[in-house]
Amino acid sequence: MNQTASVSHHIKCQPSKTIKELGSNSPPQRNWKGIAIALLVILVVCSLITMSVILLTPDELTNSSETRLSLEELLGKGFGLHNPEARWINDTDVVYKTDNGHVMKLNAETNATTLLLDNSTFVTFKASRHSLSPDLKYVLLAYDVKQIFHYSFTASYLIYNIHTGEVWELNPPEVEDSVLQYAAWGVQGQQLIYIFENNIYYQPDIKSSSLRLTSSGKEGIVFNGIADWLYEEELLHSHIAHWWSPDGERLAFLMINDSLVPNMVIPRFTGALYPKAKQYPYPKAGQANPSVKLYVVNLYGPTHTLELMPPDIFKSREYYITMVKWVSNTRTVVRWLNRPQNISILTVCESTTGACSRKYEMTSDTWISKQNEEPVFSRDGSKFFMTVPVKQGGRGEFHHIAMFLVQSKSEQITVRHLTSGNWEVIRILAYDETTQKIYFLSTEFSPRGRQLYSASTEGLLSRDCISCNFRKEDCTYFDASFSPMNQHFLLFCEGPKVPMVSLHSTDNPSNYYILERNSMMKETIQKKKLAKREIRILHIDDYELPLQLSFPKDFLEKNQYALLLIIDEEPGGQMVTEKFHVDWDSVLIDTDNVIVARFDGRGSGFQGLKVLQEIHRRTGSVEAKDQIAAIKYLLKQPYIDSKRLSIFGKGYGGYIASMILKSDEKFFKCGTVVAPISDMKLYASAFSERYLGMPSKEESTYQASSVLHNIHGLKEENLLIIHGTADTKVHFQHSAELIKHLIKAGVNYTLQVYPDEGYHISDKSKHHFYSTILRFFSDCLKEEVSVLPQEPEEDE
């Protein structure tokens, strides 16, 4: 690799001490005018040399305080972002956790803080999670926490009296030292709910006896109030499958029945003489799915459980429930989705009678996105707001806010669109009935950022950006959370600089209090030579698609650099954003002078449905085509070394990377795939069927989308496969099938297995995991230095 040579800054230019006049016999005389001119010329030349040295000297010489980023530093405390877990407990008070572990209460009107729980409490009881009761008198402390799937975990729980220090265990009746699947406070006073052996238990307060609300729970078969794997990972994106009414008098919950769903077996190889196996229901594409029912149980007086029925169209079909929300003390709004995921019906159900009325139906020729979105209702239920796809000329459909007005007598609904444009409304946050304003996050300011906006729901529908002028050099990517009465809001700055959390008044957003600065991270970042980022827009098949390049800090366009292309983990995601990002690839950029590229091609999200849904029935081919087009563009840049290209992907990204590597286009010297999906038939039903349909009807589509089909294209590739054997999301079966086909085709590969590790590698193995990836790319991408043959010595 060409590098700028080191040059000393101390340059001395001295004139000769003796200047003789030539062609003169007379005694030496000094020509003072000539000497002065000569000295001036020498000084000018020295100045120019010094200036050019300063301009051409790399950053590491001009700023010696900056150091390169190491993996040890990346995984150390200095690079840990602190999440204060801030949440509203009423309209003026926020509860959060400081970076040193104290649990505090902050008053939004006075900025006064109160210590609720000392950090020593967590140490004393070895607790890693906590939850405060609504009356702030007690705290649930979780210890011996063991992760199950992405969101779910088991734990043992203590109830701790904040004022007296009194402690007692939370156990079901006649059970000691229990391990619970879930435990949390209700919405009023000291209400408690917990789940044990797939059944829901309820306590009106901490002194009361537990009441078992369900009895049908059965391990691995019937789940009450918590999600099975499919609902947790692909549908609810949470392990919580129950919802409190605002007054705490009712509880809605799902009963998920997996009795017909085939089980997946995950062996545990270490720690015992014979391997043990864990089984859990996992429906693959086209296989039997879980059935689901929605119930509401009355918690005051005699317990009474009522089933809320699906719309008639779904009674004889398979369906999912993807969203449940209380809109009053007795009414819930529910989203029902058919198995192909192209028909969605929104109903409002009266929990006292079980009667449900249809409010909105959506259909699609592909699939319906934003399945979990919660509508925002007015207090009297006469109007509600949610995002719907709206056509914006040739750019296709974008998600925008619609206001639905319900006629009280006829139940007819009129719709008014509040926003429009070639940008996306990400999420509706709140509706203020006093000001008639709706608050939301959108990409209007930048498709790669997120800003907080308000819009009037009456008159001219004027729209204001609330966050656009807040620390705009540091923050262009936001999230927000409003207090119950919308008088205040928390603003979460997530980039491009180090994230921070601030508290604002809705009436005067410029008046704010910084709740979390992440000062340690900020201080650490200032000492590091981190990458410079640049975003370019590529025009591919009438689409404008963003490419992000991360350059080494010492980047010079005259030099040539290796390139790493990183593929997104999920379809519908967004790689090119203004979020703060420091990860293992930052180490590679810094230590090996590699340029890292991220590209949002077709199939990516937040650029309209036309871009997103191009992959329908064409999964793997469209994404690969666009990523290859981005590589062809980069190869035209003089600073990219065409002989040193590499690719990385995890999960679905590993699948796309494999499809690219086996294609006819041979650009890459090496590639790494982590937990790669190799065949969509082997993956989750809700995921595969969303994009490809049912295997029984789309056999050729599934075959064309499989990495295992025509795998000879990988013969010339230098491939590293990494997989944990206990991966419950992308099973090791995917890598086993891939390896079997690679061996059959005579393809060389390198395999790194992590015994009993899941999709997310644990902290104890993380250093080895990242070291393996970095070492592989470092060896692959190092600059080849050709050695000139030595000439034979001549005989004397």
Swiss-Prot record:
<comment type="similarity">
    <text>Belongs to the peptidase S9B family. DPPIV subfamily.</text>
</comment>
<keyword id="KW-0597">Phosphoprotein</keyword>
<dbReference type="InterPro" id="IPR002469">
    <property type="entry name" value="Peptidase_S9B_N"/>
</dbReference>
<feature type="region of interest" description="Mediates effects on KCND2">
    <location>
        <begin position="1"/>
        <end position="55"/>
    </location>
</feature>
<keyword id="KW-0812">Transmembrane</keyword>
<feature type="glycosylation site" description="N-linked (GlcNAc...) asparagine">
    <location>
        <position position="257"/>
    </location>
</feature>
<feature type="glycosylation site" description="N-linked (GlcNAc...) asparagine">
    <location>
        <position position="90"/>
    </location>
</feature>
<dbReference type="GO" id="GO:0005886">
    <property type="term" value="C:plasma membrane"/>
</dbReference>
<dbReference type="GO" id="GO:0015459">
    <property type="term" value="F:potassium channel regulator activity"/>
</dbReference>
<protein>
    <recommendedName>
        <fullName>Inactive dipeptidyl peptidase 10</fullName>
    </recommendedName>
</protein>
<feature type="topological domain" description="Extracellular">
    <location>
        <begin position="56"/>
        <end position="796"/>
    </location>
</feature>
<dbReference type="GO" id="GO:0044325">
    <property type="term" value="F:transmembrane transporter binding"/>
</dbReference>
<feature type="topological domain" description="Cytoplasmic">
    <location>
        <begin position="1"/>
        <end position="34"/>
    </location>
</feature>
<feature type="glycosylation site" description="N-linked (GlcNAc...) asparagine">
    <location>
        <position position="119"/>
    </location>
</feature>
<comment type="subunit">
    <text>May form oligomers. Interacts with KCND1. Interacts with KCND2. Identified in a complex with KCND2 and KCNIP3.</text>
</comment>
<dbReference type="Pfam" id="PF00930">
    <property type="entry name" value="DPPIV_N"/>
</dbReference>
<dbReference type="GO" id="GO:1903078">
    <property type="term" value="P:positive regulation of protein localization to plasma membrane"/>
</dbReference>
<keyword id="KW-0735">Signal-anchor</keyword>
<feature type="glycosylation site" description="N-linked (GlcNAc...) asparagine">
    <location>
        <position position="748"/>
    </location>
</feature>
<comment type="function">
    <text>Promotes cell surface expression of the potassium channel KCND2. Modulates the activity and gating characteristics of the potassium channel KCND2. Has no dipeptidyl aminopeptidase activity.</text>
</comment>
<feature type="transmembrane region" description="Helical; Signal-anchor for type II membrane protein">
    <location>
        <begin position="35"/>
        <end position="55"/>
    </location>
</feature>
<feature type="modified residue" description="Phosphotyrosine">
    <location>
        <position position="143"/>
    </location>
</feature>
<dbReference type="InterPro" id="IPR001375">
    <property type="entry name" value="Peptidase_S9_cat"/>
</dbReference>
<feature type="glycosylation site" description="N-linked (GlcNAc...) asparagine">
    <location>
        <position position="63"/>
    </location>
</feature>
<dbReference type="GO" id="GO:0008236">
    <property type="term" value="F:serine-type peptidase activity"/>
</dbReference>
<feature type="modified residue" description="Phosphotyrosine">
    <location>
        <position position="138"/>
    </location>
</feature>
<keyword id="KW-1133">Transmembrane helix</keyword>
<keyword id="KW-1003">Cell membrane</keyword>
<dbReference type="GO" id="GO:0008076">
    <property type="term" value="C:voltage-gated potassium channel complex"/>
</dbReference>
<dbReference type="GO" id="GO:0006508">
    <property type="term" value="P:proteolysis"/>
</dbReference>
<keyword id="KW-0472">Membrane</keyword>
<dbReference type="InterPro" id="IPR029058">
    <property type="entry name" value="AB_hydrolase_fold"/>
</dbReference>
<feature type="glycosylation site" description="N-linked (GlcNAc...) asparagine">
    <location>
        <position position="342"/>
    </location>
</feature>
<dbReference type="GO" id="GO:0016020">
    <property type="term" value="C:membrane"/>
</dbReference>
<dbReference type="Pfam" id="PF00326">
    <property type="entry name" value="Peptidase_S9"/>
</dbReference>
<dbReference type="InterPro" id="IPR050278">
    <property type="entry name" value="Serine_Prot_S9B/DPPIV"/>
</dbReference>
<dbReference type="GO" id="GO:1901379">
    <property type="term" value="P:regulation of potassium ion transmembrane transport"/>
</dbReference>
<feature type="glycosylation site" description="N-linked (GlcNAc...) asparagine">
    <location>
        <position position="111"/>
    </location>
</feature>
<dbReference type="GO" id="GO:0072659">
    <property type="term" value="P:protein localization to plasma membrane"/>
</dbReference>
<keyword id="KW-0325">Glycoprotein</keyword>
